[in-house]
């Protein structure tokens, strides 16, 4: 369980670094940057789950640690999958709204930008 715990903690640190970087990075209108920024909260949540699984793997007995690590890794992967799906939906919806305005801003009452 030492290897599994170490891998979980390392994955948690990497996920937390990428999530924090996405939050600190400057906001732009670029859809790719918006999608990356929208992925920050799921990345931070996955980092917390992986860190918890890693700590349990390092300190608990093997049978308990195996179950907790499996649950934490499954939860982290599920959180990242759901977060990326929501991020993609948000980005596509925002892009569709921006392209459907017709660029006739003189008489428009929408606040596209």
Swiss-Prot record:
To M.tuberculosis Rv0039. The keyword Cell membrane applies. It is a multi-pass membrane protein. This is Uncharacterized protein ML0030. It comes from the Bacteria. GO terms for cellular component: plasma membrane. Its main location: membrane. Keywords: Cell membrane, Membrane, Transmembrane, Transmembrane helix. The chain crosses the membrane at residues 1-21, 48-68. It is found in: Cell membrane. The keyword Transmembrane applies.
């Amino acid at each position: 369980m030492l290897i599994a715990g170490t891998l979980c903690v390392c994955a948690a640190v990497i996920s937390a670094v990428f999530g924090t970087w996405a939050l600190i990075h400057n906001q732009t209108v670029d859809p790719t940057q918006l999608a990356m920024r929208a992925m920050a909260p799921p990345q931070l949540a996955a980092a917390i789950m992986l860190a918890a699984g890693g700590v349990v793997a390092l300190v608990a007995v093997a049978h308990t640690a195996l179950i907790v690590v499996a649950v934490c890794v499954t939860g982290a992967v599920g959180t990242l999958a759901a977060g990326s799906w929501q991020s993609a939906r948000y980005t596509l919806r925002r892009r569709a709204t921006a392209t459907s305005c017709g660029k006739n801003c003189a008489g428009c009452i929408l606040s596209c930008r």
